[in-house]
Structure formats: structure tokens, C-alpha cells
């Protein structure tokens, strides 16, 4: 091959040509799944190594970009990096410029399990420490991003269900390394909870990936939630998502809207219940009035029995009853039926032959008069012949 057909470069030219070739021939943006190694902050820039166990490459997040990142990786974190290639011609050095970086799902789940275990050992996940939710709260603090579709849904649901409750909306960041900022808001609310008349706290975030919810696995944030002075309700992500914040809350709702539903009664249901209670009260009042009316009638009847006229009538009835009894038991009644009353000379009634002697004078009394007779013979009845 002739020398005039071989390209000739200086070192600088060669490196520049290689850089141009790489930058033109490679994707302007790409995703890298990797593990972070040796992250270091130098002059405001974050330097780190991305590795997968078989190969590694240097990466950098410039200070201007670093301020916009919502997540700061630590050594050993699994991450997904959005980046582009950077080639420094002076040293023929190649690295990845970080445009965005997020924790991988494995990192998020590992952190979740670590924090969950610590708080469980501290007793903060014990269901017996959960507080009951207020039945008709007057004031709720709602911590969520503003504006957001989740907030719009919550406000609409609250207005439809129980418009009497005041919602104190407190804007917070809900993604990235923002746990410290959320804790700051929680701290101020905890101090003012009594003055604000808070009945409960709602911590809400709309849908997203499980990695987006990683901030709600922060241990210090979850401890603050557990210590908050009023009941806490979480509505984070989707129904299948579970964070440590959900575990320490007094009630975990599947969505932000469900959190409002859990706290606010349905006014239509409440109205029906009120109408039913009114009907029960009317029925109770009617039955009570009926009982009182019957009791009054009974007492009036009892009083009527105590009047002199009524008492005299009762006495007359009793007297007549006794007269009838006396008439039924009177000897005259028996004498009229053909019987006679026998008495001796001393006027004593004779009820048998015992004690009667021959020549005794006896008096036989009939219903229309009496007869005196002299006993001529006494014939006692033979007891053995008595049938």
C-alpha cells in the first residue's frame, strides 16, 4: 500500500476524528443498567463508575445537571442511567455524561426490605398502634404535588362526598431525593396541628413506577409519619404498590382518591341514615305517647275507683254478696225444705241421740213455728248396721 493512500494524523487530529466518529455514529441518548461504584463529588460534579461485573465505564454528572437530578446514588446502588457519550480528544478518554439517573427496581426493593425490618423491630409496624380515623373530620391536611391530577381527583371527590370538611393542601415534591424536604413540611405541620385543628393527614402521590415511589421508603420520613400527632392516611401510586410509609400509616388506601373516600363520609348515605333516624325517633315518640296515654287512662280509672260514690258502690256490692252468703247459710232456708231444728230444754241444739234420755222435753223448730215433745223412747243406731 502506498504511503499517499494512508491517512496521516497528529495525535490531536486522530483523537478528534475518533471522537467525531463516535459521536456521529452512536445514539445521541441511551439507557444503561449498571451498578454504581465509587461515587465522588469533585468541584460540584459527580463522578462515578458504572459496572455490570464484566465491564466498567466512567460517568459524570455535571454540576449544572446534578442540581436537577431527583436521586443521588450511593456505592453499590443499582441504577438506570439516561446518558450520552463524551469523548475527550486531549486524552482520548471516553465516558458517559449522565442526563438522568434513577434507582433500579432491585435497589428500591432492597431498601424497602431493609427499612421495613428496622421499623418492625422498633414496633412501628404493629397494627395495634394504629389509630382510628375520624368519622366526620373538619380539617384535613393533604400533602401532594401541586398541580397534579391526583390532587384534582381528591378535591373533586371531597366536594362530592363531604363538602363541609376543609382541605388544607400543602405542596410537596414527591419524587427523587426529596425526603428531607417532605420531613421539613411534616415537622412544621406537626407543630401547628393543634392550632390548625387537624383531624387527619393525607400523604398522596399519583401513579408511577415503583422506583418513583422510593422516597416513601425513607426511614427517617417513615418515623416522622409514625410520630405524627393525628392519624395518617397514605394514597401512594397504584393498588399493587406498597411502600414503608404505607406500613407505618394508620390506614393505607390504594390510591389518592381512595384515601379521601376512607376519611370522608358519603353525604348521600349520611342523609339517608339521618332520615332513617328521624323516622325511628318519630316511631319512638309515637309509641311513648301511646304508652303515656294508656298509663293516664289507667290512672284515671284507678282514681275513679277511689271516689266516695264508687267506694260506697263497692261496699254495697260487698254487703249484698255477704247477704246472699248469709241467706244461703241461714237455717231458715233448710227449715223451708222440710227439716226441723231440735233443741233441749236449755236451748241447746241436739244433733244426735247421744245425751237424750227418756222423758226429756225437746223443742222441734220448723220454718213456721215450733212443737214441744216428750221423749218416750231412745233408739241409738247400731254402728255395725250402718251401710
From Swiss-Prot:
Intracellular or extracellular location(s): Cytoplasm
InterPro entries from the UniProt entry: Exonuc_VII_L, Exonuc_VII_lsu_C, OB-fold_nuc-bd_dom
Catalytic activity: Exonucleolytic cleavage in either 5'- to 3'- or 3'- to 5'-direction to yield nucleoside 5'-phosphates
One Pfam family named in its UniProt record: Exonuc_VII_L
TM helices/strands, residue ranges: none
A GO BP entry: DNA catabolic process
Listed GO CC annotations: cytoplasm; exodeoxyribonuclease VII complex
GO molecular function: exodeoxyribonuclease VII activity; nucleic acid binding
Keywords linked to the UniProt accession: Cytoplasm, Exonuclease, Hydrolase, Nuclease
Keyword GTP-binding among UniProt keywords: no
Recorded coiled-coil stretches: none
EC number(s) recorded for this UniProt protein: 3.1.11.6
Keyword Oxidoreductase tagged: no
Family to which the UniProt record says this protein belongs: Belongs to the XseA family.
NCBIfam families documented for this protein: xseA (TIGR00237)
Assembly description: Heterooligomer composed of large and small subunits.
PANTHER family, alphabetized: EXODEOXYRIBONUCLEASE 7 LARGE SUBUNIT (PTHR30008:SF0)
Purpose: Bidirectionally degrades single-stranded DNA into large acid-insoluble oligonucleotides, which are then degraded further into small acid-soluble oligonucleotides.
The protein's name: Exodeoxyribonuclease 7 large subunit
Source organism of the structure: Parasynechococcus marenigrum (strain WH8102)
Amino acid at each position: 500500500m502506498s504511503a499517499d493512500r494512508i491517512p496521516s494524523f497528529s495525535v490531536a487530529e486522530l483523537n478528534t476524528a475518533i471522537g467525531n466518529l463516535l459521536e456521529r455514529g452512536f445514539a445521541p441518548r441511551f439507557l444503561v443498567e449498571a451498578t454504581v461504584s465509587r461515587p465522588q463529588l469533585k468541584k460540584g460534579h459527580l463522578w462515578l463508575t458504572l459496572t455490570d461485573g464484566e465491564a466498567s465505564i466512567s460517568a459524570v454528572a455535571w454540576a449544572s445537571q446534578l442540581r436537577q437530578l431527583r436521586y443521588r446514588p450511593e456505592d453499590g446502588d443499582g441504577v438506570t442511567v439516561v446518558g450520552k457519550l463524551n469523548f475527550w480528544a486531549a486524552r482520548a478518554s471516553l465516558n458517559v455524561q449522565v442526563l438522568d439517573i434513577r434507582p433500579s427496581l432491585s435497589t428500591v426493593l432492597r431498601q424497602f426490605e431493609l427499612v421495613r425490618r428496622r421499623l418492625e423491630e422498633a414496633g412501628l409496624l404493629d397494627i395495634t398502634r394504629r389509630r382510628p380515623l375520624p368519622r366526620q373530620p373538619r380539617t384535613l391536611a393533604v400533602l401532594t404535588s401541586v398541580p397534579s391530577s391526583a390532587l384534582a381527583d381528591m378535591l373533586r371527590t371531597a366536594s362530592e362526598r363531604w363538602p363541609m370538611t376543609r382541605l388544607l393542601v400543602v405542596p410537596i415534591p414527591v419524587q427523587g431525593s426529596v425526603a428531607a424536604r417532605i420531613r421539613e413540611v411534616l415537622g412544621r405541620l406537626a407543630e401547628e396541628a393543634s392550632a390548625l385543628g387537624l383531624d387527619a393527614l393525607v400523604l398522596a402521590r399519583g401513579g408511577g413506577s415503583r422506583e418513583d415511589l422510593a422516597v416513601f421508603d425513607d426511614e427517617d420520613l417513615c418515623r416522622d409519619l409514625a410520630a405524627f400527632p393525628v392519624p395518617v392516611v397514605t394514597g401512594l401510586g397504584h393498588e399493587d404498590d406498597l411502600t414503608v410509609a404505607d406500613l407505618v400509616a394508620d390506614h393505607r388506601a390504594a390510591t389518592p382518591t381512595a384515601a379521601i373516600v376512607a376519611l370522608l363520609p358519603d353525604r348521600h348515605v349520611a342523609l339517608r341514615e339521618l332520615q332513617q333516624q328521624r323516622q325511628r325517633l318519630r316511631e319512638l315518640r309515637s309509641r311513648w305517647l301511646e304508652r303515656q296515654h294508656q298509663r293516664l287512662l289507667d290512672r284515671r280509672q284507678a282514681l275513679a275507683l277511689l271516689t266516695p260514690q264508687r267506694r260506697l258502690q263497692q261496699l254495697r256490692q260487698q254487703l249484698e254478696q255477704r247477704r246472699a252468703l248469709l241467706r244461703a247459710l241461714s237455717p231458715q232456708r233448710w227449715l223451708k225444705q222440710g227439716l226441723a231444728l231440735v233443741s233441749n230444754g236449755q236451748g241447746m241444739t241436739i244433733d244426735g241421740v247421744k245425751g237424750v234420755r227418756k222423758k226429756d222435753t225437746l223443742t222441734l223448730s220448723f220454718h213456721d213455728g215450733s212443737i214441744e215433745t216428750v221423749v218416750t223412747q231412745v233408739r241409738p243406731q247400731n254402728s255395725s248396721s250402718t251401710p
